Amino acid sequence: MKREEIADLMAFVVVAEERSFTRAAARLSMAQSALSQIVRRIEERLGLRLLTRTTRSVVPTEAGEHLLSVLGPMLHDIDSAMASLSDLQNRPSGTIRITTVEHAAKTILLPAMRTFLKSHPEIDIQLTIDYGLTDVVSERFDAGVRLGGEMDKDMIAIRIGPDIPMAIVGSPDYFSRRSVPTSVSQLIDHQAINLYLPTSGTANRWRLIRGGREVRVRMEGQLLLNTIDLIIDAAIDGHGLAYLPYDQVERAIKEKKLIRVLDKFTPDLPGYHLYYPHRRHAGSAFSLFIDRLKYKGAV
């Protein structure tokens, strides 16, 4: 087989995996028109249609899926081989792209970076704050950080933090207008300041203990915010009850700006995990970052 034919087949694999000529062209750094001609040339050579094209997507035909299943692993083996060669460099380098929730960034990732980045000056880290359940593969992240149990089962998940004590809090001003709840059922009479979840377009449900078992409660409220700091400010201003990690409101509680309630009904949340796809080649920079983050305390 000629070298050009091999290159054409590799280009087809990228189009079939991306399900898009636009994304494939960007990944291969070539024009969409040239990529379309390559695929058409392969189809003419084989006498088979490999892709079904629509205005919004590209879907492999049965023949295309078969070809992808054979060639895809070969391409990834080549990528892994090239990546392993780059790892032979004396100093790990590159950019590690992580999608994470705000609390994990503040309490785990940023503290870990204080020494990590000083020790590895040629490694860059990009953090993107996002409360959605991000697909790290399609969004081009190296890994994501979410609570244990939230990531897909086909991901490798590594625990990077302890369980998280939660707190329900309200301001003295709020409780001057509303009774202090003493049971989960009484929360129906209260306003909540909720965390916005972009994946579902709804508010975060509160994990509480009711009747001896954990339940997820949807709270009603007029405010839907997307950062912890804004929720804390709104709670201090008396807009309602907030459900937050205890370490983020501990100071405000000690300063009597907030009052904690229902602490016996708020179970700890499972600790944060770093997750990434099984097929991802763990380069030296990424491996070092994983080793730095691994939780070494008692689970």
Curated annotation (Swiss-Prot):
<comment type="function">
    <text>Regulates the expression of genes involved in peptidoglycan (PG) degradation. Could play a role in switch control between recycling and degradation of PG peptides. Negatively regulates the expression of the ycjY-ymjD-ymjC-mpaA operon by binding to the PgrR-box. In addition, other genes are predicted to be under the control of PgrR, including genes related to membrane formation and function.</text>
</comment>
<keyword id="KW-0805">Transcription regulation</keyword>
<dbReference type="GO" id="GO:0003700">
    <property type="term" value="F:DNA-binding transcription factor activity"/>
</dbReference>
<dbReference type="GO" id="GO:0045892">
    <property type="term" value="P:negative regulation of DNA-templated transcription"/>
</dbReference>
<dbReference type="Pfam" id="PF00126">
    <property type="entry name" value="HTH_1"/>
</dbReference>
<protein>
    <recommendedName>
        <fullName>HTH-type transcriptional regulator PgrR</fullName>
    </recommendedName>
</protein>
<keyword id="KW-0678">Repressor</keyword>
<keyword id="KW-0238">DNA-binding</keyword>
<dbReference type="GO" id="GO:0006351">
    <property type="term" value="P:DNA-templated transcription"/>
</dbReference>
<keyword id="KW-0804">Transcription</keyword>
<feature type="DNA-binding region" description="H-T-H motif">
    <location>
        <begin position="21"/>
        <end position="40"/>
    </location>
</feature>
<dbReference type="InterPro" id="IPR000847">
    <property type="entry name" value="Tscrpt_reg_HTH_LysR"/>
</dbReference>
<dbReference type="InterPro" id="IPR036388">
    <property type="entry name" value="WH-like_DNA-bd_sf"/>
</dbReference>
<dbReference type="GO" id="GO:0003677">
    <property type="term" value="F:DNA binding"/>
</dbReference>
<dbReference type="Pfam" id="PF03466">
    <property type="entry name" value="LysR_substrate"/>
</dbReference>
<comment type="similarity">
    <text>Belongs to the LysR transcriptional regulatory family.</text>
</comment>
<dbReference type="InterPro" id="IPR036390">
    <property type="entry name" value="WH_DNA-bd_sf"/>
</dbReference>
<dbReference type="InterPro" id="IPR005119">
    <property type="entry name" value="LysR_subst-bd"/>
</dbReference>
<dbReference type="GO" id="GO:0043565">
    <property type="term" value="F:sequence-specific DNA binding"/>
</dbReference>
<feature type="domain" description="HTH lysR-type">
    <location>
        <begin position="4"/>
        <end position="61"/>
    </location>
</feature>
<dbReference type="GO" id="GO:0071978">
    <property type="term" value="P:bacterial-type flagellum-dependent swarming motility"/>
</dbReference>
